[in-house]
Design a protein with these regions (language model features):
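Cytosolic regulatory regions of ion transport systems
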Residues: 1-77
Length: 77
């Protein structure tokens, strides 16, 4: 299954590792390269560096072709 995860923080990273272990094809979008680097070293993912809310990053990740899209970005009040 093709999964796109929007956000590589604590929750996004945990979900990514679980989904990769289950054999899913996971793409992760995050604006912080260091988060993507850390996650890439722990799991076989396709990292996309960019604003998780931008149309460009979502297009680069082919979010429209994903079987599952998960957004785990922080809540800002």
């Amino acid at each position: 299954m093709k999964v796109v995860i929007d956000g590589a923080g604590e929750i996004g990273s945990h979900l990514t590792k679980l989904l990769v272990r289950e054999g899913n094809d996971v793409t992760v979008i995050d604006s912080e390269k260091s988060r993507l680097d850390n996650l890439s070293s722990a799991a076989d993912i396709e990292p996309i560096e960019g604003d998780p809310t931008s149309i460009k990053a979502l297009g680069d990740a082919q979010a429209g072709k994903a079987d599952l899209f998960i957004a785990v970005v922080p809540y800002v009040d």
